[in-house]
Each structure stands twice: as structure tokens, then as C-alpha cells.
């Protein structure tokens, strides 16, 4: 076949063109993303019961839902959060669970639980599929100098959200910063008592004023008429004249006993954009959608959307991920170009021929571009990890070309013609190429069998790299020999390499031969050195600070203001504004948007901070956070937490402000509160941690109404009536629905806030008894002050408290978790108090447990494949003996660069396994051939093989090293994710380049002698 290809050079060139064109077409179709799509199958269930306390929501709504949902197959984690009037249950499924099938099971479970839920719920629980690991791709702000926030929210919900959701690639559009408009009825309790109106009667009057149902039609022989009544009241003015009752010939209207205003459903919610009030829309993408194209489509639609807005409404883009992604990918492309250029430079310097350098110059782009076609077929995207695979592949795919090219060049230098040299050269190294390719491929194919997050995260990297390597094998066997036969010339005709470089390499070659001969005479000492290197590997790995993923500088910060749970919404607003003004003072900040109250809790606020592009600011995201922390003024009752938003966020169940979270669980709620406070206080004292924030253990003030049930029964008052009156008075109860062609709105009933500033208002609340008489609440009850949780959390079916935390500067996640374990041991936490890591920390812990098994599995897989190829149990051990030196180099380089051992560094270690094995395969394969063909002794064969293979070994190592060097030196956006990979490869190759040139021949000889001894022993026994 090779001979036939050599006689068909045009076919080979057209094959290269076909591969390149196929890849180029696929490249234009690939989606763009910062990281591979890692979908955590997650479903969020929401239920509402306006006015219900958090504890009531947890026991009457969350608990029945959890019992039903917890029985669904494939649920890996279940947590719930209950606050005033709302419950949120988060279900996380196993990574291999089909989300659509899970959604059907969730709907069935909700239907099964409906009979156990309270009857007063305004609607059935709803669910939606979410991907909590995915950051929003875009955010818009709606603001107006004249319109209230509720009207802006209405525009966003009824117009913008609908239109945006129709754009291809848009997943979910979420609104925050206010709520839908509502007619708010704020009742004067004194007027109620004066006119003798009961709250339940008032509620019924309001509900009866807004009927909406079929009213029929009239028919005659020739005509038909629809029967209709005037429409529903729409505004506060329409409700002011509502007749509540007639008394003693007088008409009592709503305006006489209540203030009626055009308001919002939830007055404890607000939003902002920089200095102005605003409603914020955050947009996420659909799984697999091209972020760049989706954002471009949104930007293209914005002029039309702005035209739909009133003239006094501004629609502003405040968050756009595309510039950062463009910059990151641009830096990755530059890094790829530098890597290719450096690799070609290595070939030219060693072979000294422009023609020779041109051959891998063709092979590299053919292999890399053709890989895009494989990426497209697998549904991959252009992202940091897949581009890192291509950057590394630039140094690996050239290895095969170098081996073929160097061997053909060697035969040319011996006097063979180009065609004969090409044929003999490729035949000699054909098996070597297959062994090198399979050895490297099996490393990354092994990762695909690990499952879990590691497999999902590195699937694109692994398959992309394996595809490039396999294509490289085809190109090296089918195309490179043909190009060599046409382009290469004997040394007399070719442009020779610079004489100085030739002389230097000749001296190196001579020195290596002499030193190798001396080392072969001290085999035991070299084997002891190798054993020491193995031990040093284990020590350095155990001591290396370990982390999950490198912290990225995305230019997006998240801030969280945690207020004292006893503070009201109005009290917290100026405190939150202090932090907002602080953020806006920093020159690197471009925009800040956020929400106050709402589902976050009355006293809390979330900030989304957008920094200027990296080219326009001097500080990194971490330095901006350090400045904000250092300059944050003391705010009584307020805490400000900050962290850098990441492209990949592991889902947690508590919505903590820190980067990581610890869940504390118990069935005994008082014990849970006691121990969660002790644990969180202990964590605050750990110097390795910062921003420790406990969620769920704080208490807000409560008025506890103690009802004398016997007295209430004597007075003809039942508990249902009491609960209804209290709900009507204090819970922002939605008592009627207003139907509109565009949306549905509510009428909200409550006591006037002017009368609810003191618990004494309870003495003026009246309840209607069974006989129609009005009975003061104080006639059968007393009240006292107490404490209650502002939010109630469950993890699984247990009450839980979440403690969020971040790491101090220079502290790895492993060190932080070890410090927490030590603190827990000192506290002697009892067995009935359970703890569990969540979010990034949980994923890190799982990956850390899997790492040794993953490394062992890769080594076993390599051993088996090499054993099959070489038909020997010993030669694979020789090849594997090269790995310890690479590991030592990688771990030392990480330590010197002060980089933690993260999953990206682990990926670099796997790459090193494949690269350094190539060196041993080149040497051993040639030595075995010399033993078979020329009958040389093992010592002579390995010495000669090492001398003859020195040039390709050095070339392939330098190609890999220089190909990874741009990863180390890159300073642009996204470099913090690529640098650990580059440092690992460069450090490992620098050490292994030197050591393996000596240890491989020694191990080969030792194992060959062992083989001969065993063979002799068997012969004697036979």
C-alpha cells in the first residue's frame, strides 16, 4: 500500500486537501463556548402559599413534595429552601439520567403530592429544567425616569421575555428587581372596627367585584347577541368606589376603610443598574447553543425590541459574555499559532532544510484542521479545553511526521534516492508509529470510562486529542512519505543546516554516546536512582496542594449582601446602597446590577458586577475584590461577600455567598441550630478561610400568638377563621385575579403598614364568630416575642444549615478542607449532626478520591495494550519506567510556579505519560529490530538504538516542549486555565528528556537479562 501511495503523489495531495476542506467546513459550524457543555440534570420545583411563614411552608408544602420527589429514580441530591410564602425544591439527578424522562417523573410526583398540600395555594406547584452550572450569557436592564418598577417588570415579563425566548439559542429569561403590577388594598383596622366590617367580608367583596366567566348569548330566528357585562376593575381608582356593604341606609365604600393604590405583588423587592432603579433580565443559553451566535442574534433583535418600548423606557445591555469569550479564544488561537511556528522551527533547526521543514508545515495544519470534522460529528464546541487539546496536539501530531521524516532523511544521508529512502524509512518505523499512537490514545480513551464529572469535563479534550493523533498516523503513513519522495533531496543538493548547530549537535551526540557507555557500566546505581525518583513522585504528589479547577479571571464578579434577619426591607436599602456606591467607585468597574429582597430574603441583596475588558484595566478580578474588601466601610447589621464568577459552577443547594459550601444536617432542629452556630463560628476563626457565611441558622424576630382554643370555641370562633383573618391582615394576600389580554394581575389585601409597625395592632384585629358577632382577637389570645428562621432549608429530608466559605489567598481547596476537618475534630461534633460538602468542594472531594484509581487505571490500560503489541510482559515495563521522571518534573514545576495540582494539571500529567512513552518506544523498537535483524547483543543493540534515535527523540521532545511553551507564557484572557497544563508539560519534558535517555537503556538491559535467565532456567528444566 505504501509503495502504491508513493507512486500516486497527486492522490496523496488531494487526500490532504480533502481532509483540510472537510475540517474547514466543520469549523464554521462548530458552536463557541468558554468550556465544554457540562449539563447537571437538575429540576427546580416551586410552590407558593402567600403569607405562610417559612416554617409553615417547610412543614406543609416542602415536606410533602420532598416525600413524593425523593422516590424518583436517579435523584443524586435533593434540597429545599422555604421562605415567606414560597418553597423551592432542587432535584439533582445522576449525570447519565435523561432530563426529559426525569421531568415526566417529577410531574407525576407533584400530582401525587397535590392531595397533601394546603388548599389555599393559588396554583399547583410548577417545575422547570435548569442547569445551575451555566452562567448567564447576557443581562439587560430596563429603567425609566417616570415609570414605576412594577410597570417596567410588566414590560419585561409580557413583551421582552416572550420575544427573547423565541430567539434561536436562548434558553431561559429570568426577571428580577420587582414583581408584576397589582392593585394593593391597605386596610385601616380602626375604620374596619368603626364600620363593623369583617376582613373576610371585605376579601369576599373584592373577589366578587372581579368575576370573569361565560355569560351566555341570546338567540332569535334571525339574530344572535352575546351577553356581556362591564369589564373587571383594573386600577386603584376603579376599586375606590367599590361598595363593601350597606349599613343603616348608608353605603360603605372601599375608599372609606382602606388605601387603594396601583402597586406591585411584592413590595419587598427592588432592583438597580448602577445609580438608577431598574428591572434586570438575565438570559441563559440552550444546551449546545453557540454563545457567540446567540448573543449576536439577541443584539440584532435589540433595535426591534427597543422600538416596542415606550419612549421613556431605556433598554440597556449590562452584561455580555461574547467579548470575553472572543478575547479568550483569540488568545488561544494566537497560542496555537505560536506553538505551530515553534514546532516547525525545531524541525528546520535539526534537519537544516527548508524543504524538510515544509513537510511538517503541511502535516500539522492538515491534522489539526481535519480534527474539526471529528469535533463536529461528536457535537463538540470550540472552547478553552478543546483548543488546548489542539495546542498540545500541534506538538504531538508532528512527532509522527518527525519520526518518518528523520528516518527518511537518515537514509538519504546514507546515499539512497528519495523514493527508496521514503519507502524504506516509513516501513522501518511503521510499527513504531502504531505503538506510539495506540499508547497515547489509550491514555485518553481510559478517561472516557471514568464516568462522573471528570469524564464529562474532559471528554471533548480527550476525543479531540485522540482524533488529532489518529489523523496524524494516517497523514504520516500516507502523505508524509509521498511528500518526502517529491520534495526531499540528497544532502549535496539540499540546503544544509547551519554549520555551528551541526557541530553542536555532533558534540552532544558524541558526549551522549560516551556517557551512556559509562552509565551502562553502573546499572545498579542507575536503578537505585530510578527507585528514588519513584519515591520522590509519591512524596511530591502527596505534598502538592490540590484544587479543583484554576480560578479564572472572567471579568464578572458576584457580590452578596447579607443583612441582619431582624432588619426590615426599608432599613436595609440604605445599607445596601453603601456597598453599591463602593463598587461603583472602583475605576475597573463598568456596570453593576442587582436585586434586593424578593426570593433572596427581605434583608439580602445580590450584585452582578461587570468589569472593564482586561485590556482596559490594570487589576485582575481578584485584585479588584481585594480592594473592595479593604475599602468596605463598616455597616451595622450588614456583611458584603465577593467572589469571581466562573464559567463552570457546581450546583449547590443553599445559594451561599462563598465559592464553596458545607451542609450541616440533623433531624433535631434545636440541636442543628446550636451546632451550626458553633461550626460556623469555628470556621470564621480558620485563617485559611474567608467570607464564612451561615445560611439558615440566623433568626428573625417573631410575634407568637398564643390562642386559647377553649375560649375561642366558647366564643364561636374556629381556627380556620383565625388563620384566614391573620392571613388577610399581614400576608400580602392575593384575593382576586385581573385578566388582561397580555397577562394576569392580582389584587393584594393587607393591613395598612402604618398600623403594623407595632405588635399592638393585634389588639385591634377582629374575628367574625359563627353567630355573626365580631370578636376581638385579644379576647381569646395573647402574644409574646420570639425568634424564627427567615428561611428554612432541608437537605434530603433533614433540616439543614448551609455554611458558605471562600479560600484565603494562596490556600488550595485541599488545604482549606483539611483545616475544616481539623476544626470539626476539635469541636467533637456528635454523630447525630451530619455534614456534607456541596458545590465545587463536593465535586473536588469526589475527583480527589478518584484520582489515584484513574492514574492506576491508565497505567494498567497502557501496560495491557503494549503487552499485546510487543507480545511480551517485560517490554511494557521498560516503557512505563519512563513515567516517574516526567511526574517528578511536572510536580516540581508546579511547585516552583506556585500552581496547585488541579484537574487541568492532572490532564497535563496524562499528556506527559503519552509523550515520554514515545521516547522509550522509539528506542526499544529499534533495539529489538537490531537484535532480530543483525543478531546484536542486548547491550550493543540498546546502545546503538539510543545513538541512532537520539535526534528524533530530542526533536519530538523539543517539539512538545516548545509547543506547550506558549501555554506557560500566555498572559491574555483565559491564560489562567491554560497555564497549569503548559507548566506540567514543560516541567515534565525538561526532566524526562535527560533522565529517560539513561534510565530506559538500563531498565531494558535489566529486563532483558531477567528474560534470558528465565529462558535459561526453563530450558534447563526442560
Regions found by a protein language model. Give the residues of each.
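Juxtamembrane segments of multi-pass membrane proteins
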Residues: 530-631, 635, 657-658, 679, ...
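Transmembrane helices with small-residue packing motifs
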Residues: 10, 18-53, 111-121, 376, ...
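Cytosolic juxtamembrane regions of multi-pass inner-membrane proteins
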Residues: 308, 325-334, 350-352, 380, ...
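C-terminal transmembrane helical bundles of large multi-pass transporters
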Residues: 266, 321, 387, 631-1010
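Signature of alpha-helical transmembrane segments and their immediate interfacial
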Residues: 1-31, 429, 497-549, 638, ...
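Transmembrane alpha-helices and their membrane-interface boundaries in multi-pass membrane transporters
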Residues: 2, 394-408, 430-449, 456-498, ...
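Membrane-proximal extracytoplasmic
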Residues: 1-341, 382, 456, 638-639, ...
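Interfacial segments of transmembrane alpha-helices in multi-pass membrane proteins
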Residues: 3-9, 287-290, 326-383, 445, ...
Amino acid at each position: 500500500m505504501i509503495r502504491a501511495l508513493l507512486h500516486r503523489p497527486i492522490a496523496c495531495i488531494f487526500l490532504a486537501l480533502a481532509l483540510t476542506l472537510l475540517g474547514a467546513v466543520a469549523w464554521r459550524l462548530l458552536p463557541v463556548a468558554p468550556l465544554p457543555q457540562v449539563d447537571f440534570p437538575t429540576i427546580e420545583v416551586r410552590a407558593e402559599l402567600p403569607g405562610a411563614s417559612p416554617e409553615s411552608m417547610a412543614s406543609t408544602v416542602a415536606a410533602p413534595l420532598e416525600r413524593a420527589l425523593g422516590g424518583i429514580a436517579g435523584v443524586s441530591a435533593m434540597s429545599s429552601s422555604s421562605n415567606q410564602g414560597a418553597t423551592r425544591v432542587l432535584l439533582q439527578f445522576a449525570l447519565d439520567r435523561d432530563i426529559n424522562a426525569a421531568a415526566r417523573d417529577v410531574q407525576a410526583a407533584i400530582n401525587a403530592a397535590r392531595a397533601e398540600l394546603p388548599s389555599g395555594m393559588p396554583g399547583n406547584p410548577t417545575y422547570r429544567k435548569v442547569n445551575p452550572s451555566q452562567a448567564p450569557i447576557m443581562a439587560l436592564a430596563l429603567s425609566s425616569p417616570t415609570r414605576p418598577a412594577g410597570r417596567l417588570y410588566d414590560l419585561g415579563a409580557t413583551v421582552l421575555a416572550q420575544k427573547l425566548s423565541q430567539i434561536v439559542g436562548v434558553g431561559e429569561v429570568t426577571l428580577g428587581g420587582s414583581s408584576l403590577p397589582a392593585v394593593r388594598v391597605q386596610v385601616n383596622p380602626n375604620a374596619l372596627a368603626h364600620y363593623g366590617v369583617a376582613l373576610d367580608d371585605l376579601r369576599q367583596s373584592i373577589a366578587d367585584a372581579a368575576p370573569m366567566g361565560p355569560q351566555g348569548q341570546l338567540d332569535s330566528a334571525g339574530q344572535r347577541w352575546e351577553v356581556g357585562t362591564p369589564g373587571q376593575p383594573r386600577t386603584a381608582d376603579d376599586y375606590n368606589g367599590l361598595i363593601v356593604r350597606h349599613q343603616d341606609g348608608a353605603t360603605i365604600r372601599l375608599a372609606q376603610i382602606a388605601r387603594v393604590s396601583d402597586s406591585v405583588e411584592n413590595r419587598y423587592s427592588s432592583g438597580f443598574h448602577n445609580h438608577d432603579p431598574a428591572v434586570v433580565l438575565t438570559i441563559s443559553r440552550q444546551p449546545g447553543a453557540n454563545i457567540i451566535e446567540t448573543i449576536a442574534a439577541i443584539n440584532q433583535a435589540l433595535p426591534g425590541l427597543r422600538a416596542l418600548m415606550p419612549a421613556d423606557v431605556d433598554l440597556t445591555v449590562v452584561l455580555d459574555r461574547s467579548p470575553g469569550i472572543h478575547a479568550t479564544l483569540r488568545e488561544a488561537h494566537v497560542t496555537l499559532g505560536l506553538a505551530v511556528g515553534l514546532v516547525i522551527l525545531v524541525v528546520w533547526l535539526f534537519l537544516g532544510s527548508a524543504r524538510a521543514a515544509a513537510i511538517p508545515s503541511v502535516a500539522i495544519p492538515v491534522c489539526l484542521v481535519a480534527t474539526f470534522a471529528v469535533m463536529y460529528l461528536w457535537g463538540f464546541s470550540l472552547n478553552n479545553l478543546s483548543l488546548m487539546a489542539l495546542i498540545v496536539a500541534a506538538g504531538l501530531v508532528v512527532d509522527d511526521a518527525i519520526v518518518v521524516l528523520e528516518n527518511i532523511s537518515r537514509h538519504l544521508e546514507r546515499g539512497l534516492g528519495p523514493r527508496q529512502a521514503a519507502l524504506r524509512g516509513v516501513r522501518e518505523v511503521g510499527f513504531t508509529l502504531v505503538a506510539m499512537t495506540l499508547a497515547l490514545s489509550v491514555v485518553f480513551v481510559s478517561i472516557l470510562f471514568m464516568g462522573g464529572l471528570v469524564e464529562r469535563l474532559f471528554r471533548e479534550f480527550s476525543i479531540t486529542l485522540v482524533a488529532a493523533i489518529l489523523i496524524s498516523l494516517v497523514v504520516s503513513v500516507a502523505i508524509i512519505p509521498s511528500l518526502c519522495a517529491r520534495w526531499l533531496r540528497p544532502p549535496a543538493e539540499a540546503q544544509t543546516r547551519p554549520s555551528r548547530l551541526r557541530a553542536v549537535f555532533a558534540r552532544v551526540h558524541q558526549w551522549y554516546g560516551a556517557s551512556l557507555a559509562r552509565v551502562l557500566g553502573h546499572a545498579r546505581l542507575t536503578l537505585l536512582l530510578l527507585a528514588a525518583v519513584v519515591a520522590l513522585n509519591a512524596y511530591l504528589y502527596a505534598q502538592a496542594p490540590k484544587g479543583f479547577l484554576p480560578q479564572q479571571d472572567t471579568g464578572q464578579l458576584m457580590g452578596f449582601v447579607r443583612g441582619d434577619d431582624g432588619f426590615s426591607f426599608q432599613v436595609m436599602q440604605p445599607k445596601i446602597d453603601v456597598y453599591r456606591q463602593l463598587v461603583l467607585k472602583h475605576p475597573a468597574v463598568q456596570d453593576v446590577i442587582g436585586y434586593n429582597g424578593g426570593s433572596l430574603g427581605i434583608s439580602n441583596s445580590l450584585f452582578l458586577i461587570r468589569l472593564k475588558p482586561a485590556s482596559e484595566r490594570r487589576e485582575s478580578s481578584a485584585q479588584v475584590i481585594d480592594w473592595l474588601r479593604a475599602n468596605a466601610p463598616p455597616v451595622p447589621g450588614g456583611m458584603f461577600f465577593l467572589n469571581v464568577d466562573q464559567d463552570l459552577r457546581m450546583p449547590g443547594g443553599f445559594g451561599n455567598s462563598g465559592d464553596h459550601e458545607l451542609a450541616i444536617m440533623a433531624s433535631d432542629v434545636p440541636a442543628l441550630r446550636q451546632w451550626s452556630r458553633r461550626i460556623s463560628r469555628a470556621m470564621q476563626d480558620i485563617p485559611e478561610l474567608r467570607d464564612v457565611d451561615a445560611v439558615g441558622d440566623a433568626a428573625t424576630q417573631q410575634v407568637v400568638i398564643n390562642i386559647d382554643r377553649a375560649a375561642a370555641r366558647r366564643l364561636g370562633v374556629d381556627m380556620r377563621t383565625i388563620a384566614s383573618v391573620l392571613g388577610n391582615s399581614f400576608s400580602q394576600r392575593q384575593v382576586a385575579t385581573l385578566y388582561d389580554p397580555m397577562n394576569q394581575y392580582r389584587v393584594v389585601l393587607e393591613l395598612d403598614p402604618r398600623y403594623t409597625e407595632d405588635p399592638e395592632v393585634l389588639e385591634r384585629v377582629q374575628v367574625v364568630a359563627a353567630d355573626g358577632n365580631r370578636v376581638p382577637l385579644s379576647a381569646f389570645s395573647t402574644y409574646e416575642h420570639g425568634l424564627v428562621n427567615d428561611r428554612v432549608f432541608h437537605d434530603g429530608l433533614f433540616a439543614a444549615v448551609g455554611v458558605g466559605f471562600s479560600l484565603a489567598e494562596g490556600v488550595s481547596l485541599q488545604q482549606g478542607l483539611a483545616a475544616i476537618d481539623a476544626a470539626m475534630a476539635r469541636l467533637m461534633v456528635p454523630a447525630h449532626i451530619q455534614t456534607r460538602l456541596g458545590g465545587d468542594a463536593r465535586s473536588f472531594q469526589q475527583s480527589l478520591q478518584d484520582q489515584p484509581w484513574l492514574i492506576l487505571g491508565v497505567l494498567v490500560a497502557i501496560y495491557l495494550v503494549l503487552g499485546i503489541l510487543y507480545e511480551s510482559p517485560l517490554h511494557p515495563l521498560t516503557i512505563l519506567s519512563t513515567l516517574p521522571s516526567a511526574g517528578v518534573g511536572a510536580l516540581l514545576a508546579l511547585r516552583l510556579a506556585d500552581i496547585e495540582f488541579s484537574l487541568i494539571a492532572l490532564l497535563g500529567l496524562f499528556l506527559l505519560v503519552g509523550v515520554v512513552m514515545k521516547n522509550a518506544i522509539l528506542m526499544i523498537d529499534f533495539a529489538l529490530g537490531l537484535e532480530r535483524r543483525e543478531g546484536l547483543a542486548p547491550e550493543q543493540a540498546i546502545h546503538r538504538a539510543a545513538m541512532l534515535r537520539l535526534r528524533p527523540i530530542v526533536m519530538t521532545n523539543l517539539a512538545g516542549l516548545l509547543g506547550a511553551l506558549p501555554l506557560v507564557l500566555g498572559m491574555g484572557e483565559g491564560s489562567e486555565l491554560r497555564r497549569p497544563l503548559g507548566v506540567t508539560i514543560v516541567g515534565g519534558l525538561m526532566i524526562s528528556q535527560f533522565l529517560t535517555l539513561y534510565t530506559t537503556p538500563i531498565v531494558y538491559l535489566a529486563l532483558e537479562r531477567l528474560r534470558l535467565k528465565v529462558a535459561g532456567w526453563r530450558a534447563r528444566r526442560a
